[in-house]
Amino acid sequence: MGDKEGACFMKIAKYLDKALEYLSILALVIMISLVFFNSVLRYFFDSGIAFSEEFSRICFVYMISFGIILVAKDKAHLTVDIIIPALPEQYRKIVLIVANICVLIAMIFIAYGALQLMSLTYTQQMPATGISSSFLYLAAVISAVSYFFIVMFSMIKDYKESSDK
């Protein structure tokens, strides 16, 4: 990939990052607003917004899904690394490669399972919103596939950097 393609790819990645950040914030704001206003309406008027619980759940699921992608991109997930820093450099690389391969396998299982759940619930609609139930499982597919590619590209980048040394 040349400099021009690399710069174009980085620009697209930057826009996608910003879009995911804004979508996550939007989902959080909508979720909090719906829950708050629904609680106020139920407390004062003994009736609430019919679709607020379902739509809040959708917002929560997608907010988490987008957050998974954003955190994976920055390698900012919580990790327990008591043993890894104590290992010699050559073993540390092997352990990290094995861990990344395990993550890739897990993402394949998650994406496959979520696709199966999507196909099973495709015809079911949520009662208040009428949105297909499979829409919730789409978030798992999106985050698992995105996480898979982020880890894969990270492994390729790490390999290229280590082979350049």
UniProtKB/Swiss-Prot annotation:
Keyword Transferase listed: no
Subcellular location per the Swiss-Prot or TrEMBL entry: Cell inner membrane
InterPro entries noted in UniProt: DctQ, TRAP_DctQ
Signal peptide, first to last residue: none
Single GO biological process annotation from the record: C4-dicarboxylate transport
Membrane topology, record value: Multi-pass membrane protein
Family label: Belongs to the TRAP transporter small permease family.
Name of the protein in its database record: Putative TRAP transporter small permease protein HI_0051
